Amino acid sequence: MRAVHFGAGNIGRGFIGSLLAASGYDVVFVDVNEQIVRLLKERGEYRVIVAGEQREEQWVRGVSALNSQTEREKVIEVIADADLVTTAVGPPILPAIAPVVAAGLQRRFAIQQKPLHVIACENMIAGTEALKQHVLAHLSEAEQQLASEHVGFLNCAVDRIVPNQTNDDPLAVTVEPFFEWAIEARNVIGTVPPIQGAHFVADLGPYIERKLFTVNTGHALAAYLGYLRNYKTVQEAMNDEGIRLNVEQALSESGAVLVKKHGWSEKEHHAYIDTTIGRFMNPSLSDDILRVARSPIRKLGPNDRLVAPAVQYCALFGKVPHGLAKGIAALLRFDDSRDAEAAALQQTIAQHGIEGALRQYAGLESAHPLVAAVREEYDQMDENKRL
């Protein structure tokens, strides 16, 4: 079996590529980083360090690589013969790889019609569907019909902390022990592709929301509260009992929303929350607070990690979630001048107040009870950024 994976960065090597290799695929990485591509070609293997209570080294073998800029024809050839195509390139790059994926499908349709599955492993909702639309734009009507019959575009949700890192060996990558790869099965063509460690589900929606309202919510809260106390990493922030209790309160609130909406076991979801808290406190990882906190305007969105669970909590339970409100207030205090969104957010607050910022970016009218709660928490965080 052969898998073509776009993106030989830390997530590509440390998460997706390692699972595919363990599943028996010959993995061909496709990237533009000439050093990484060259080393993968020369060595055919790399090291993954799993940073748990005890560090474990895993060797990923039987891999190769191609440069998508200088070896485009070879990339087309391997797609034409592949069993699986995956990506971990970042959402903005999906349109850039679509032309070569489309060319690979065109070559494939000319020589064979065996099923191919495409899975975009990106930190976005419906990432594979987005890639599919970009690819279809480069195909004729007849080729689009062939794609609908022989290519399964499978949406997925991925979760593994792979922190920013610098290693002596450019191919080595450190990851946390926990991972989740949930793949929606509805568009499978023929048989489900064998992927060790992944699980196929009928409806991906609840899994995406569980991660967004737990992992992303908690991560953001720890970062914004940690920033106010001048911590450098999420791990440092989570060792502050006050911050940890704030995060636990917010995740209890977002968890109540999930349990109510999806009919889940409260006990099982609280175990998931406990696991998530443990991941944030992993002393073997160093998760930079400025990296986690960046792009606050996006994270203040009405469908994102803080406002969405808070608004739904208000609607479901008729009261304000004070833990989530404190997280939103801390986000509004994030003023790192190196972050363009943080600078724009602070300018909006200076001109229109936090009510104006919440209206513009979170879609919250001033009369919404959450706004008053956020204002109260915000005012308690003075200009010296004390909690």
UniProtKB/Swiss-Prot annotation:
Residues the record lists as binding NAD(+): A3, V4, H5, F6, G7, A8, G9, N10, I11, G12, R13, G14
Domain of life from the UniProt record: Bacteria
Pfam families recorded: Mannitol_dh, Mannitol_dh_C
Entry protein name: Mannitol-1-phosphate 5-dehydrogenase
Alphabetical list of NCBIfam families matching this protein: PRK02318.1-2, PRK02318.1-3, PRK02318.2-1, PRK02318.2-5
UniProt keyword annotation of DNA-binding present: no
GO biological process: mannitol catabolic process
This protein's UniProt keywords: NAD, Oxidoreductase
GO cellular component: cytosol
Record field: catalytic activity: D-mannitol 1-phosphate + NAD(+) = beta-D-fructose 6-phosphate + NADH + H(+)
EC number per UniProt: 1.1.1.17
InterPro entries found in the cross-reference section: 6-PGluconate_DH-like_C_sf (IPR008927), 6PGD_dom2 (IPR013328), Mannitol_1_phos_5_DH (IPR023028), Mannitol_DH (IPR000669), Mannitol_DH_C (IPR013118), Mannitol_DH_CS (IPR023027), Mannitol_DH_N (IPR013131), NAD(P)-bd_dom_sf (IPR036291)
Protein family (similarity comment): Belongs to the mannitol dehydrogenase family.
Gene3D superfamilies membership: N-(1-d-carboxylethyl)-l-norvaline Dehydrogenase, domain 2, NAD(P)-binding Rossmann-like Domain
Organism: Geobacillus kaustophilus (strain HTA426)
Molecular functions per Gene Ontology: mannitol-1-phosphate 5-dehydrogenase activity
